[in-house]
Amino acid sequence: MSSLTGKLIVIEGLEGAGKSTAVNLVVELLSQKKISTITTREPGGTRIGEILRSIIKNPEYNNVLDDRSELLLLYAARIQLIEQVIKPALNEGQWVIADRFELSTLAYQGGGRKMDMRVINELSNFCLKGFKPDLTLYLDINPELGMIRAKSRGKFDRIEQESIEFFHRIHDTYHILVKQNPEIMMIDANRPLEDVQSSIQSVIEEFIEHNL
């Protein structure tokens, strides 16, 4: 597959939506087609990115980390990820499967933190220079159900400790973004796992068919 141009597939959604499971499923489906893949996550995916992740997610920084600082840290991590991991992999013909990307910032910082979307978009244009995923799957889940699932994983991190109203704002913003960007594929993640996986498989198989 090295002779082919790689693709970037992003999995988005609230906590507890099943993003990690979806990433693994996408990798399996691509592997069946002999497509070389790598996985990554946001924030993180590089040495610097993981350091920034530890700051952003650390509960010790509750009420300490300014929203603007958080936003800048996220973009710093994203730049490192794009330049050090994603672009090199795509240039080698690999398909990159990412747990979160730009849409998360718009939803969490723009929606959850109520930050000015114009500022975020300007920062995005400066940092990403138009770089976009080839496919985004948004796993849509009720915030209450998502947090119940997330809680079963263990202790909450700094973001997961936010109020349920915070996650409802994110959820609402995701829906607005999906309506504004019809290329984003929304999948109902409130359903049983096998139904969610079946929907993901259908989307991925169609995407593969049109890109091989």
UniProtKB/Swiss-Prot annotation:
InterPro entries: P-loop_NTPase, Thymidylate_kin-like_dom, Thymidylate_kinase
E.C. designation(s): 2.7.4.9
GO process terms (BP): dTDP biosynthetic process; dTTP biosynthetic process; dUDP biosynthetic process
GO cellular component: cytosol
Binding site for ATP: 13-20
GO MF terms held by the record: ATP binding; dTMP kinase activity
SUPFAM superfamilies reported for this sequence: P-loop containing nucleoside triphosphate hydrolases
Function: Phosphorylation of dTMP to form dTDP in both de novo and salvage pathways of dTTP synthesis.
PANTHER family assigned: THYMIDYLATE KINASE, UMP-CMP KINASE 2, MITOCHONDRIAL
Family the entry assigns: Belongs to the thymidylate kinase family.
Protein name as catalogued: Thymidylate kinase
